[in-house]
């Protein structure tokens, strides 16, 4: 991801064996007993991942079926969610009570291997739009909205294969929403048309993510049916391409940053294009023309 990237550490089934994290009375959910420990595992038929770098307070609980909840306060960085491992080009239904205060994402999030790719279908976010540090590739129309497609590169960053250099693919919805159906096959097909192919699916979750922020999120995930093959036989209703360049609208060369100059980052008010090179994400606060 563009503003914070997470390595979801796989642990053995024995390590992840958990006491059920909810108390029940006459079949009714009363209170969570304790936070689910960080790690990966299965819960009520769904794969889940919970990673935190330990900063601030983050409490994650698995709920019934595809439900989970997470509350965070002054958290440094975390990613949590439920879904599938492996993922697929499926339609995913979700509902969320998503209440971020600061930098946060609500997305369909996953990885592929060969090539190693981290991807986001971003449905809602907090105060930071990651597009400012990404390269715009085109647009697609799916599920009643336009999505802008972006690409980013992470260099020597954590991944599901350890520290690595890999690409990120993003679809960012033009109108935020906290519930609906995401036809992932449309995004995967559009990305391929735009020169952004996925490889073999790894895990795929509806994730809540936070970075130096607070908030709460309760999400229910369900498969909505539809295509489950790695390559969708049908594509989105429309796809358009844009020339390679920064995520913002093109600016005259004279107003773009020079090679090795800053071109993005949270709070950056200067040029977001490069007169030479490409705007590359470095960290949450700094992107550079390289």
From Swiss-Prot:
Keywords per UniProt: Carbohydrate metabolism, Glycoprotein, Glycosidase, Hydrolase, Polysaccharide degradation, Secreted, Signal, Xylan degradation
Top-level enzyme category: hydrolase
Region (Disordered): 223-248
Biased composition (Low complexity): 234-248
Keyword Secreted found: yes
Reactions accelerated catalytically: Endohydrolysis of (1->4)-beta-D-xylosidic linkages in xylans
Pfam families cross-referenced by the UniProt entry: CBM_1, Glyco_hydro_11
Temperature and activity: Optimum temperature is 60 degrees Celsius.
Any single GO BP term: xylan catabolic process
pH-dependence annotation: Optimum pH is 4.5.
Annotated glycan sites: 26
Enzyme Commission number(s) from the entry: 3.2.1.8
PANTHER family, A to Z: ENDO-1,4-BETA-XYLANASE A-RELATED (PTHR46828:SF2)
UniProt name for this protein: Endo-1,4-beta-xylanase B
Species of provenance: Phanerodontia chrysosporium (White-rot fungus)
């Amino acid at each position: 991801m563009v503003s914070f990237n997470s390595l979801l550490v796989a642990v053995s089934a024995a390590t992840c064996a958990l006491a059920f994290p909810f108390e029940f009375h006459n079949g009714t959910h009363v209170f969570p007993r304790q936070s689910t420990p960080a790690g990966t595992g299965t819960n009520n038929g769904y794969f889940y991942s919970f990673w935190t770098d330990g900063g601030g307070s983050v409490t994650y609980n698995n709920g019934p079926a595809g439900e989970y909840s997470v509350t965070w306060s002054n958290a440094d960085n975390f990613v949590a969610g439920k879904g599938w491992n492996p993922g697929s080009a499926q339609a995913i239904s979700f509902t969320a009570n998503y209440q971020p205060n600061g930098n946060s994402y609500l997305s369909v999030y996953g990885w592929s291997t060969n090539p190693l790719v981290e991807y986001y279908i971003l449905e809602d976010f907090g105060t930071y739009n990651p597009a400012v540090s990404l390269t715009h590739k085109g647009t697609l129309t799916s599920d009643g909205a336009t999505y802008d497609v972006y690409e980013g590169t992470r260099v020597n960053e954590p991944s599901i294969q350890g520290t690595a250099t890999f690409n990120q693919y993003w679809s960012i919805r033009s109108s935020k929403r906290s519930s609906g159906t995401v036809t992932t096959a449309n995004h995967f097909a559009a990305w391929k048309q735009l020169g952004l192919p996925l490889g073999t699916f790894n895990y795929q979750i509806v994730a809540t993510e936070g970075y130096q922020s607070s908030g709460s999120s309760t999400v229910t995930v369900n498969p909505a049916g539809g295509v489950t093959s790695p390559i969708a036989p049908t594509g989105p209703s429309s796809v358009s391409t844009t020339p390679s360049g920064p995520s913002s609208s093109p600016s005259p060369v004279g107003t773009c940053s020079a090679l090795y100059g800053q071109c993005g980052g949270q709070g950056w008010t200067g040029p977001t294009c490069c007169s030479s090179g490409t705007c590359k994400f470095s960290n949450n606060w700094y992107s550079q023309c390289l």
